[in-house]
From Swiss-Prot:
It comes from the Bacteria. The gene is kdsA. The lineage of its organism: Bacteria, Pseudomonadati, Pseudomonadota, Gammaproteobacteria, Alteromonadales. This is 2-dehydro-3-deoxyphosphooctonate aldolase. It comes from Shewanella piezotolerans (strain WP3 / JCM 13877). GO terms for cellular component: cytoplasm. GO terms for biological process: keto-3-deoxy-D-manno-octulosonic acid biosynthetic process.
């Protein structure tokens, strides 16, 4: 299958195009922090010439502990998203967890995300598809890459072909994830754009008993490896104070490192996509 290109305004999302950054923060902690992070991303990506989509969650409905911070909720979250969109002229991506959230969220954001833990929930898939929005499907940690075709088929049957596939690691025993680089290449064979969530792939699920641990010291190495595959995009989360972030701080990139980090990722992407394909199957 040929590479599918998804048009998001002036941004082209495809495996054979310059990579798109899907980045921001894990969960909305406050309006001011969200604006600060969005401004930093906007400035850095504009300087480096990287197409950019702002990401944050309004509700983390799948936290390990009932006492963990979840976010401001949909109503307040959408207000913050609207302000970010109008202030910085940025497209937006966020996740939904329930059927009733799909339509109102799709009125504000450009891409709605299907969480990995919910990727086989047919009613949610159908509701998302019917919004007509671009969809980002997080590959579940428990599914093989080739099984993503079943999720794609559900969206297609519900009338939506604007699909992005996102790798975020696979379960490797207890409290650990690994990334199958060949699995991302296998998903690329579908023709749909494939992006790599390089920060969530650093998770150690349940590694801190009541919350996820992580390995942000290896954020650069893992992302470089993924970008060497020639992907449609990179998905990352950053925070000005990762040690005190309200969710997934151990995986978050320190915000002050963003420009250096993205400079390297762009260099890898540019280099890999300058190569002529080699068919080693023959």
């Amino acid at each position: 299958m040929s590479n599918k290109t998804i048009d998001l305004g002036s941004i082209e999302i495809a495996n054979d195009k310059p990579f798109v950054l899907f980045g921001g923060m894990n969960v909305l902690e406050s309006r001011d922090l969200a604006m600060q992070i969005a401004e930093t991303y906007a400035e850095v990506t504009q300087k480096l010439g990287i197409p950019y989509v702002f990401k944050a969650s309004f509700d983390k409905a799948n936290r390990s502990s009932v006492n963990s911070y979840r976010g401001p909720g949909m109503e307040e979250g959408l207000k913050i998203f609207e302000e970010i969109k109008s202030t910085f002229n940025l497209p937006l991506i966020t996740d939904v967890h329930e059927v009733h959230q799909c339509a109102p969220v799709a009125e504000v954001v450009d891409i709605i995300q299907l969480p990995a833990f919910l990727a086989r929930q047919t009613d949610l898939v159908v509701a998302m598809a019917k919004t007509g929005a671009i969809i980002n499907v997080k590959k579940p940690q428990f599914l093989a890459p080739h099984e993503m075709r079943h999720i794609i088929s559900k969206f297609n049957e519900a009338g939506n072909d604007e699909i992005i596939l996102c790798e975020r690691g696979s379960s490797f025993g207890y409290n650990n994830l690994v990334v199958d680089m060949l699995g991302m290449d296998e998903m690329k064979q579908s023709g749909y754009p494939v992006i790599f969530d390089a920060t969530h792939a650093l998770q150690k699920p349940g590694g801190r008993s009541d919350s996820a641990g992580g390995r942000r010291a290896q954020a650069t190495e893992l992302a470089r490896s993924g970008m060497a595959l020639g992907l449609a995009g990179l998905f990352i989360e950053a925070h000005p104070d990762p040690d005190n972030a309200k969710c997934d701080g151990p995986c978050a990139l320190p915000l002050h490192q963003l420009e250096n980090y993205l400079t390297q990722m762009k260099a890898v992407d540019d280099l890999v996509k300058s190569f002529a394909p080699i068919d080693t199957s023959k």
